């Protein structure tokens, strides 16, 4: 027990000295992510997006990979969309590009891309890449996803989903 407390104390000292994050930053550590609420000597408290409080031992934190999402003012927003092989690829890319460029939260002087990410078994996976202010990330992502779906529906672009054919043998 003392070994664990000493590890948490040492981790707390390291966090306070090296400052890999600060109160208010949004971090990802292992299976946990949230906004840093307090940094104490033994524990760091996060609040998750669904308002749960997570107490992470500083010993664990100091020995983990920490992704500090809130450290920078801007964040790249990557969204994957799949279309059917029979859908018009050029039209789908044009629609995605138009939607991104029409969104006021997108930083227009940074690179905006619509690419074919992969050719999969049952679909063509496209990806959009654009930059937003970190605080606009989630709202912009949700808005873009809804707009992508709506425009694909209006223009007959199929979004495939997994299907299972069941054959009954008598």
What residues fall within each predicted segment?
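Conserved small/polar residues in nucleotide/adenosyl-binding loops
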Residues: 1-5
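Short, structured beta-strand/loop micro-motifs enriched in basic residues and often containing a Trp
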Residues: 6-15
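Hydrophobic alpha-helical membrane-association signature
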Residues: 9, 95-96, 140, 144
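Soluble accessory domains appended to multi-pass membrane transport proteins
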Residues: 14-109
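Solvent-exposed, non-transmembrane regulatory segments of membrane-associated proteins
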Residues: 69, 87, 107-170
